[in-house]
């Protein structure tokens, strides 16, 4: 067989180029598939979140109970609540049970004044703050207390998903006084914190376990935060 030597350089160059292309492709895939490594520790991330949340003027929140409920003053068993929080108060809508009756209640708190709807008639009236079942509710303090008291913080196994950091830990039940009122003081429920990986704003809190005396061990409270620094203002009911 005759070998044409003038073909060898071309064949060699082609093979070399092909090898480089394959190598670059593999290298690119390796970079893309490399797991994300957090640049801060869980404790640092929680501290950064606390600072970020302190700088907010307002946000929206929602409280749900995949398991259980929260007992408020007046034997009100709250199952769901949501509203807006500003620097001078909040507006909350809640769904609850009184005995076997299902009721909806709305309350507006502006500075030192509180208005609330009658659970049976839906009519608004101004009430003394201490007479409101939401008298202990302070979402701003709640967020600060949870972020300030999270213990044994650790990243979830897949801690960064869709630009979120998920931190697991425990909190003293007394930390939740600003939302549940009466607490089982010695209890230490589990907590999961979902943070935005860029801004460190707190997006979701999942509290699992006993926080109130009436709670079961499988009680789950989920607090979702959103609409950070949206343009909102609180107004008294008309």
Go through the PLM ranges and name each one.
Residues 64-70, 97-101, 112-121, 210-214, ...:
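Hydrophobic lipid-interacting interfaces of membrane-associated proteins
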Residues 76, 98-101, 148-152, 185-188, ...:
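Short solvent-exposed loop/turn micro-motifs enriched in small/polar/acidic residues
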Residues 53-60, 80-92, 107-114, 161-162, ...:
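Short, solvent-exposed coil/turn segments at beta-strand boundaries
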Residues 1-24:
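Sec-dependent bacterial lipoprotein signal peptides
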Residues 84-142:
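An acidic-aromatic
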Residues 117-179, 183:
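Flexible, processing/modification-adjacent segments and terminal tails
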Residues 20-84, 157, 230-238:
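N-terminal leader/targeting segments and the immediate start of mature chains
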């Amino acid at each position: 067989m005759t070998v044409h030597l003038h073909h060898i350089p071309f064949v060699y160059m082609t093979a070399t180029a092909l090898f480089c292309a394959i190598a670059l492709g593999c290298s690119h895939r390796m970079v893309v598939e490399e797991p994300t490594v957090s640049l801060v520790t869980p404790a640092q991330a929680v501290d950064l979140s606390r600072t970020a949340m302190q700088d907010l003027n307002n946000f929206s929140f929602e409280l749900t109970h995949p398991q259980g409920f929260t007992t408020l003053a007046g034997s009100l068993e709250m199952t769901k609540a949501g509203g807006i929080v500003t620097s001078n108060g909040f507006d909350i809508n809640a769904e609850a049970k009184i005995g076997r009756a299902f009721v909806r209640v709305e309350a507006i708190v502006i500075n030192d004044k509180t208005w609330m709807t009658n659970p049976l008639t839906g009519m608004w009236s101004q009430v003394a703050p201490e007479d409101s079942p939401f008298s202990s509710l302070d979402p701003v303090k709640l967020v600060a207390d949870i972020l300030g008291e999270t213990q044994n913080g650790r990243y979830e196994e897949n801690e960064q998903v869709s630009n979120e950091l998920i931190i697991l830990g425990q909190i003293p039940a007394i930390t939740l006084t600003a939302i549940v009122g009466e607490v089982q003081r010695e209890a230490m429920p589990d907590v999961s914190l979902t943070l935005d990986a860029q801004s460190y704003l707190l997006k979701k809190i999942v509290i699992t376990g006993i926080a109130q005396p009436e709670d079961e061990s499988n009680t789950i409270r989920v607090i979702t935060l959103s609409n950070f620094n949206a343009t909102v203002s609180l107004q008294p009911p008309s």
